[in-house]
Curated annotation (Swiss-Prot):
Keywords: Glycoprotein, Hydrolase, Lipid degradation, Lipid metabolism, Secreted, Signal
Location within or outside the cell: Secreted
GO molecular function, one term: hydrolase activity, acting on ester bonds
Name of the protein in question: GDSL esterase/lipase At5g45910
Enzyme active site: 37, 345, 348
């Protein structure tokens, strides 16, 4: 009995530690975020682009918020942990001020990220016959326009803006993952996705440059996650050719090679921007390597359930992914303890996985250069 009680106490302590906020270690007074569903805290839900989306109801948000918030996870995202580490409130979605009657104070930051967003503009995909697959047209350029509209309410004069943005952190991404996901899930070839990489990188460089011209001094630009470990894409490319899977983690190597290509090009682009803007601190965040820690050694990081199988989904197969029965829809099921899973709904990760990635970033271990 005593052993059982000790186990219960230890387990309860572990769960409580996992749910604790990050200890404030960063010194930013405001955060401005641009991206897609990896960092959207409610804009897609507020946009009304899709009627009654599944992310607008439980089990989304069940772990930390106990309600759906528009985040594509069971709880907090990387941006939430960065806000906690900065001693800031969770960054409000920009559309909250436009779609509700709430009075929103953006002085401490604003989140412009939208789930489903792409780096490239809507017409870029339309010209390639992919417009019907897009969830939203709130691209990176549109998010930049939102920031420009908000800026006059944050500071008025050039000296005032310089003072204000000197203490601000800008996150540009992760963005670009959907530029590849849309064609891949639409059964386009790997070559088609590979050919998009230069266009994606150029757009990220353009928007990062524009933000610096607007006054941004410290910017984090994350790379792509190991998409070959994504449950939805693993199901899409379910292949019996064992040699295409990484023996260390069973992730699909061609997809991860695409992510590596994106990240390599991104790092080169950022190196060029550092030369162009030597006064700005431009930081690459290595989401890929940070995530590969738990994909390679799941049990070491507490993922005793699964890292490749989705916690929430409607599939009967290996990855619990069924396009016609998404997480939160009738017929879907949710695992008992999301903290033991890395994949949340097939596309997005769990709060536990995001916390590990955020910890690596905040410590400086997976940023180049460090920013703490």
């Amino acid at each position: 009995m005593r052993i059982n009680m000790l186990f219960i106490v230890a387990f309860s302590f572990l769960v409580s530690v996992r749910s604790l906020p990050m200890r404030p270690t960063l010194k930013y007074e405001s955060i401005f975020n641009f991206g897609d569903s990896l960092s959207d805290t409610g804009n897609f839900l507020l946009s009304g682009d899709v009627d009654s989306p599944n992310i607008g109801r439980l089990p989304y948000g069940q772990t930390f918020f106990n309600r759906s918030t528009g985040r594509c996870s069971d709880g907090r995202l990387i941006i939430d942990f960065i806000a906690e580490a900065s001693g800031l409130p969770y960054i409000p979605p920009y559309l909250q001020s436009l779609r509700t009657n709430d009075s929103v104070d953006f002085k401490r930051g604003a989140n412009f990220a939208v789930a489903g967003a792409t780096a490239n503009e809507f017409s870029f995909f339309k010209n390639r016959g992919l417009s019907v697959t897009l969830l939203t047209n709130k691209t990176l350029d549109i998010q930049l326009d939102w920031f420009k509209k908000l800026k006059p309410s944050l500071c008025k004069t050039k000296p005032e803006c310089e003072q204000y943005f000197r203490k601000s952190l800008f996150l540009v991404g992760e963005i670009g993952g959907n530029d590849y996901n849309y064609p891949l899930l639409a059964f386009r070839s790997f070559k088609h996705a590979m050919d998009l990489v230069p266009f994606v990188i150029n757009k990220i460089m353009d928007v990062t440059s524009a933000l610096i011209e607007e006054g941004a001094m410290t910017l984090i630009v994350p790379g792509n996650l190991p998409i070959g470990c994504s449950a939805a894409l693993l199901e899409r490319f379910n292949d019996n050719s064992g040699w295409l899977y990484d023996s260390r983690n069973q992730c699909y190597m061609p997809l991860n090679n695409l992510a590596k290509l994106h990240n390599d090009k991104l790092k080169k682009g950022l190196a060029a921007l550092r030369k162009k803007y030597p006064y700005a601190k431009i930081i690459y965040a290595d989401y890929y390597s940070s995530a590969m820690q738990f994909f390679n050694s799941p049990s070491k990081y507490g993922f005793t359930g699964s890292v490749l199988k989705a916690c929430c989904g409607g599939g009967d197969g290996r990855y619990n992914v069924q396009p016609n029965v998404r997480c939160g829809e009738k017929g879907s099921t949710t695992c008992e303890d999301p903290s033991t899973y890395a994949n949340w709904d097939g596309i997005h990760l769990t709060e536990a996985a995001y916390r590990h990635i955020a910890t690596g970033l905040i410590s400086g271990r997976f940023t180049m250069p460090t920013y703490n």
